[in-house]
UniProtKB/Swiss-Prot annotation:
SUPFAM superfamilies tied to this protein: Nucleic acid-binding proteins
Assigned keywords, A-Z: Ribonucleoprotein, Ribosomal protein, RNA-binding, rRNA-binding
Keyword Zinc among record annotations: no
Protein name: Small ribosomal subunit protein uS17
Lineage: superkingdom: Eukaryota
UniProt family annotation: Belongs to the universal ribosomal protein uS17 family.
GO biological process: translation
Recorded coiled-coil stretches: none
InterPro entries attached to this UniProt entry: NA-bd_OB-fold, Ribosomal_uS17, Ribosomal_uS17_arc/euk, Ribosomal_uS17_CS, Ribosomal_uS17_N
CDD domains assigned to the protein according to its UniProt record, in alphabetical order: Ribosomal_uS17 (cd00364)
Name of the gene encoding the protein in the UniProt record: RPS11
GO CC terms, sorted: cytosolic small ribosomal subunit
């Protein structure tokens, strides 16, 4: 079923492993030996979440976490932690006295499911969920690799 690397036996809580049936269901739910769900909001469930063998109770697709609240976009600033990334959001703040803007940023820690491969510089879309730890309140829903810009042209290009 899954890579057993912990002392406790890893299993999904909604799947009965001793079933005599061998049918693999392709509908969201408990068909087969893997539970997965569609989170809605226009986000597709990744193929790795459906066919993969990882166990992650904090994954929005295969775990017990529901996405509600804010949906934010940002850039992966750090991917050094285990299953957690830091998402950097840049914005402009207006200074009334000088009638100018200054650059500011905010760092948001987000849980990343093993079904995603996230590197520094990738654009990610994160969704708010219940508190997963002391600081983590968001979950990665979609990853856009750094090389693909998604059809957006650069403003200034050399001819």
């Amino acid at each position: 079923m899954a890579e057993q690397t912990e002392k406790a036996f890893l299993k999904q809580p909604k799947v009965f492993l001793a079933s005599k049936k061998t049918g693999k269901g392709k509908r969201p739910g408990k068909g087969g030996n893997r539970f997965w769900k569609s989170i809605g909001l226009g986000f597709k469930t990744p193929r790795e979440a459906i066919d993969g063998t990882y166990i992650d109770k904090k994954c929005p697709f295969t775990g017990t976490v529901s996405i509600r609240g804010r949906i934010l976009a940002g850039t992966c600033h750090s991917a050094k932690m285990n299953r957690t990334i830091i998402v950097r959001r840049n914005y402009l703040h207006f200074i009334k006295k000088y009638q100018r803007y200054e650059k500011r940023h905010s760092n948001i820690p987000a849980h990343v499911s093993p079904c995603f491969r996230v590197k520094e510089g990738d654009h990610v879309i994160i969704g708010q969920c219940r508190p997963l730890s002391k600081t983590v309140r968001f979950n990665v829903l979609k990853v856009i690799p750094a090389g693909s810009s998604g059809g957006v042209k650069k403003a200034f290009t050399a001819i």
